[in-house]
Regions:
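Helix-to-loop junction immediately C-terminal to a conserved catalytic motif
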Residues: 65
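Short coil-to-helix segment of the ABC ATPase nucleotide-binding domain corresponding to the Q-loop/switch region
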Residues: 110-118
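Conserved ABC ATPase signature
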Residues: 150-154, 158
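Catalytic Walker B motif of ABC-type/P-loop ATPase nucleotide-binding domains
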Residues: 175-178
Length: 240
């Protein structure tokens, strides 16, 4: 099912949590990396974002997180035009979004436990209230025995699983994940997928950028497919 700059999928236009309308994006004076992107995601939906390297997946996620700015078109987040959001208000909105970056962005001076708990601490949570939940989550991603370790002593796969745990610990309104299973084995990949599905069942809107075709096929979730910076598919896996 294809989309264009003026058409939105019928099942996503009811109070979308995220909406792109004719969006283009470029870095500096370079050619556009995103071209005429239009779609809308309803609250509580689950989508994969697919496409070859360089198709624009990471750039699209950066727009949603307000790490980059569109060169044209309109991006709405929680019903608000991102370009109209005051800089002082952006940190609050970002706290409603859980993000798994490819580069992890862990704090080296904190333990795995404290890295995972950081969003709860920033939100004003008390350690006595969240200690058990954080420990349980770290156990779920296979880091129970490593919760007191510093990031420098973790493997690439362990760092990735820690970054995922940190992104979901606060049950965000939106979860954005950029290649979240790229450094883990199939067993952990399926466990991570189940974690995302459970979070989605609790109401979080999930958007996962991935090259993992097996993960997409196993999930049965709808796909946003990018080719050359254009949105070429909206629908179930394998339907164009």
């Amino acid at each position: 099912m294809s989309t264009d700059a003026d058409t939105f999928p019928a099942d996503t236009v009811d109070a979308p949590v995220l909406r792109f309308a004719g969006v283009g994006m470029r870095y500096g004076r370079s050619p556009e990396v995103l071209k005429d992107i239009s779609f809308a995601l309803r609250p509580g939906s689950f989508h994969f974002l697919t496409g070859a390297s360089g198709a624009g997946k990471s750039s699209l996620l950066k727009l949603i997180y307000m790490a980059e700015q569109a060169s044209r078109g309109r991006v709405e987040l929680f019903g608000r035009d991102i370009n109209a959001i005051a800089p002082a208000d952006r940190p609050f909105l970002r706290r409603r979004i859980g993000v798994v970056f490819q580069e992890f962005r862990l704090l080296e001076h904190l333990s795995a436990f404290d890295n995972c708990a950081l969003p709860l601490r920033i939100a004003g949570g008390k350690p006595d209230h969240y200690r058990g939940d954080v420990a349980e989550l770290l156990g779920w991603v296979g880091l129970k025995a490593r919760m007191h370790a510093r990031p420098a002593t973790l493997s690439g796969g362990e760092k990735q699983r820690l970054a995922i745990a940190r992104a979901v610990v606060g049950r965000p309104d939106i979860l954005l994940a950029d290649e979240p299973t790229g450094n883990v084995d199939q067993g952990h990949a399926l466990r991570i997928l189940r974690l995302f599905v459970e979070l989605n069942r609790l109401g979080t809107t999930v958007l996962i950028a991935t090259h993992d075709e097996d993960l997409v096929a196993r999930s049965g979730q709808p796909v946003l497919h990018l080719e050359g910076g254009r949105l070429m598919q909206y629908g179930r896996s394998g339907s164009r």
